[in-house]
Every structure is written in C-alpha cells, then in structure tokens.
Amino acid sequence: MSGFSTEERAAPFSLEYRVFLKNEKGQYISPFHDIPIYADKDVFHMVVEVPRWSNAKMEIATKDPLNPIKQDVKKRKLRYVANLFPYKGYIWNYGAIPQTWEDPGHNDKHTGCCGDNDPIDVCEIGSKVCARGEIIGVKVLGILAMIDEGETDWKVIAINMDDPDAANYNDINDVKRLKPGYLEATVDWFRRYKVPDGKPENEFAFNAEFKDKDFAIDIIKSTHDHWKALVTKKTNGKGISCMNTTVSESPLKCDPDAARAIVDALPPPCESACTVPTDVDKWFHHQKN
C-alpha cells in the first residue's frame, strides 16, 4: 500500500540479510508494532513475508530491534520450505497481520494449546505474486486452526483488496466455490510440509475444517488484545523486541534517530543475491496418511 517502503540490508539468502520497513516520511518502523492492524474499515493490513511460489522461509524477526524480515535459520543453516509434490514452495502469498500476537502464555479455548509467540499468519489467495516486505490491505475470509508441535498456529485466509476478483469473495464458502480444491490443498500443504525435514505431520483443531469470516475476525481481535498487553509490558514478552516508533502508550517507543542507528549498524545493501542451494528445487514425494 502507498506510504510504506522497504530497505534491504546485506545480500538476499545470506545469514545477514534483513528487510526493514519505512513509513511515508522515510523513517524506519517495526512491521510488527508500527503498522496499524487496520488499513480501512473491515480491511486488515498484511505484511508479506514470503511471495507465492518461493521457498525461502522469510519471517518477521520478532526478537530483533525493529523486527525486520529475515530468513529463518536452524543450526546456522538458512531454511527453505521443501517442494512437497505437487506443490512448489508456498502456495499463497504468506505473511502476518501486524499488531497481533499469539500469546504463548494463553491457552486457546478452541485448540487447548498455547500460542506460538508470533503475529498471526495470513495466506493471501489473490492472483498477484506480491513482493517480500510489501504491505497490502486484505479482506479476511476465514481461518484454519493448525496445531504445530503442540502450539496454536492460526492461519487466516484472506484476499488482497486490490485483486480484480476481491468483490466476489466475502466468506470462506466463496473460496470453496470459486477456487475448488484450494482449501483442501492448503490443509494438505500445512499438514505435510515439515515431513521432508523428518518431523511428523501437523494436526488441526475442528477436524481441519475452515471457520468462517466472523470467527476469523474474532480470533484476530483477540490476538490484537494480546499484542496490546505485550507492547505495553503488561505481559511477559518471552524475549520479543517491542521497540517501536508510534505506540504512544508503549514504554519501548523510540525516536527516529534511535531507529536509524539500529539499521546503520548493519551491513549495507548488496546488489547481488547469494547463491541458493540447488537442492531447494528438489521435489519430495510422501505418502499421505
């Protein structure tokens, strides 16, 4: 959306790579805390972390100052999601709704599990392949309750408000009708995507059924309330950085110069990306249970 821009630091697909967000004044901001949850009435902001069809597991760095987007790392190795046949990378634009938080200290009444300590995830199903760090306005359509290694990990289904077909989508049943097979593929993808890494299949609440728009919005609002408690230090942040530039009631609000100092301490932008390992293109075949 207009008003937000990105600035890369270091080379893409490197351990040092970061994507910082800026506001309309060119000042650095946190995509987690400073971008409003709402873009308009009944329209939510979404921070795109992973463009559709790509494999690099990019995410908001919740524990880093200003929460830039970076590639997830495990045992000093950059993480890429596997291509689990018949899928290529992520099958939607994947990201998060800002100013939300799935509280690891809160036992969700629907799933019986605590939150995963991240902003709530979004799968954007429109036709455009978005850019990493792009901020879009989305219409929420429904939600899936995934249980990831014993933690609640909600997956919001939404569509870009700028999509030419957005007016035709108003609830989860419209996705079933207009994109047959997409929701079933979404469940299958989330169920099995960690199997190539040697992990078990993920589980779901509600027998892997998608809940409707109203249910989804209620869940988003509850995660927004948890975020408010987080950013105002009324709850334990579990190591999360709440440094921000706009939340007046937050004790961790900083001025633009302090935010700039965080970015200036990092390596400069790099025109060329690092080489992506060739095995990222490998296709994995796994028998469905």
UniProtKB/Swiss-Prot annotation:
GO molecular function, one term: inorganic diphosphate phosphatase activity
Classification via CDD domains: pyrophosphatase
Sites where the protein binds Mg(2+) 2: D121
Subunit structure, interactors included: Homodimer.
Positions bearing N-acetylserine: S2
Modified residues (Phosphoserine): S250
Single GO BP term: phosphate-containing compound metabolic process
Residues involved in Mg(2+) 1 binding: D116, D121, D153
Record key words, sorted: Acetylation, Cytoplasm, Hydrolase, Magnesium, Metal-binding, Phosphoprotein
Reaction(s) catalysed by this chain's protein: diphosphate + H2O = 2 phosphate + H(+)
Modified residues annotated as N6-acetyllysine in this record: K57, K228
EC class name: hydrolase
Family: Belongs to the PPase family.
Cofactors required: Mg(2+)
One Pfam family hit: Pyrophosphatase
Cell compartment(s), UniProt: Cytoplasm
Name of the protein described by the UniProt record: Inorganic pyrophosphatase
UniProt organism field: Pongo abelii (Sumatran orangutan)
Enzyme Commission number(s) from the entry: 3.6.1.1
